[in-house]
Amino acid sequence: EGQMEVASIVSKPVEGVNAGKIENIELVSRAIREAMSEAEEQLGIRITEAYAGISGDFVRCARHTDHVFVYDPQNGVNQKDVDALFDRMRNVQAPDDETIMERVPQNYVVDDNQEVKNPVGSFGKKLSSTFNFILCLRTPMQRLDMALKRLGIKMLGVTSNAIATAEAVLLPDEKEEGVAVVDIGGGVTDVAVYYRNVVRYIATIPMGAMAINRDIRTMSVPEKHVESLKQKYGSAVADLAPEDKLIRVNGRTAREAKDILLRNLATVIEARATDIAEFVLQEIRDSGYAGKLAYGIVLTGGSAKLKDVDELFRRVTGMDVRIASAETGVAEESREKVVDPAYATAVGILLKGAEQGACAVIERPASPASRSAEPRPGFQPRQPQDVPEFRHMPRFQQPAQGPASAAAQPASDEDAAARGQEREDEQLKAPVIEPKRKRDWGSIFQKTFDKINKSFTAAEDEEI
């Protein structure tokens, strides 16, 4: 039924990554090797190819509008006109330091005034469309490829984590009626906005769970206890935490044990979580679809498990919020394996890879083998360029011709030649997407601690 069975899922901590960017290839390769070796041992297979996901503030979207002249206006738009428009979009160039990962059509417009879902059969002289280009800086993508190549793994393709996550958690009605997917990861928070079944906007906020953990450490909590303290006793909404309940956190010795008021812990968590929610809201507004998201926000990622985080997002954004794990496209018998929202992105990457025809090629050795940096003898991995850039180019059905269209005369040879020349002239132009404008994130940390200090000061004033 087109659903995916998850055979194994392995998660390993990784160092050498900062806000999604690989800073130490050796450490990243080591973590990938450990995870893959464990999965191979569980399943008795050897993995030689991978489809990857990437995330960071170096991934962005940019819109570009272009048009073609309809080849035979008297008989209306046909599939060749749509294909010609897609060819035009193939010619759009990224800035020198970026590469285009995906091109997503947003709409079709005939003669600048009639927006249609299916342009084939519409009458007009010009067919236009706006495409959403998903771009990534070349350097982070090259480092990801290098980390995999060190293990003899061929990277068949790469997708935006924001889009992959959405594919795993969203329901059809949510995609159609409007929703924002918010994936709160360790180093970054990804946002993807969907409307009318199309991804309209993606963005990455360079902070996530690790920023919250760093704030908790300022309460003199040992690093090894931070995550468990946050998950077991933390809350993203301070006024929902107990006012007078204490929790003892052990230090290296009994003498260093520390009592922490849960309300204070929640105050620290809420300050940073509010920052994240406010920046998410700003990205949703920047998308231009804030007023069209009937289904509000879908939260996922490891930090979606934080107590009351959904309530915090409701208060900050004023939108409906639900917490989701990977269910879309996953076979029912596999859903228990991926019930943790932290696995949503990994499942989404698998779904995107299968959609692009980049399913991993595996073999079953007689006995589990250790990972080698060399592919098996005679193995010819699929090349990334073999995956079509427009795998889902729409193939619209030509409407049945009625009496009016049947009586229409085809364009003259002169008109057809003129249209052809116009298309050739257009093909010579290669538009370049504008470089990214950097957002200023510099004030967020001071802003967070100002909130914390204000809250603590107010509490002290009340005691006095």
Locations of regions flagged by a protein language model:
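Short acidic loop-to-helix transition motifs that present clustered carboxylates
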Residues: 160-167, 211, 328-331
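Phosphate/pyrophosphate-binding loops at sites that engage ATP/ADP/AMP, CoA/4′-phosphopantetheine
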Residues: 35-48, 277-295
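Short beta-alpha connecting loops at secondary-structure transitions
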Residues: 200-201, 210, 214, 261-265, ...
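Nucleotide/phosphate-binding catalytic cleft detector across ATP-hydrolyzing
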Residues: 2-50, 54-179, 222-223, 228, ...
